[in-house]
Amino acid sequence: MVTFEELNSQNHKIMELSKVLQAVIQDRALCDNEVTCDLFFMYVDQVKGHLDVEDRHLYAALLNHKETGVNYTAKQFLSGSAEIKRIFESYLHKWCNKRAILIKDHQSFVKETEDMFRLVLNRIQDETEQLYPLIRKVSGDSRVAA
C-alpha cells in the first residue's frame, strides 16, 4: 500500500535535495567533496526510488481502467517515467563513476544538472496537479494511492 502522504514526502525530500544541490554545485570547489557527493547520490536514489514506487504501484489500475482518458494519462506518466530514467542514466554515465562525481567542464556540469533538476521538478508538479488528483478521483480514496 502506498499513501499520498508517502508520495508527497518523497517529492518533498527530492525538492529539498535539489535546492541544496543547486546552490552547492555553483561553487566548483564544493563539487568534489564527499558531502556533496553523498547528497548528490541521495538525490539520485530518491528520484529512482520514487519513480520505481510509482511504476510498481500506481499505474496498473489506471491502465486497466474503463475510461480511455484515464488509460491515456497513465500511459503518458509511465512513458515519462521511462524517459526520465533514460535521461538520468545518460547523465550519470557522463558525470559519474562508481558513486563519484567526475567534472571535467564545470559550466557544462552545472547546466546539465540544472536541466535535470528542472525535468524532475516539472515531473513532481505534474504528479501533484494531474496524476494524484486522477488517482483520488478514480479510486475514491483521498488517503491511499495504491
Describe the role of every protein-language-model region.
Residues 1-146:
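Small-residue-biased structural context
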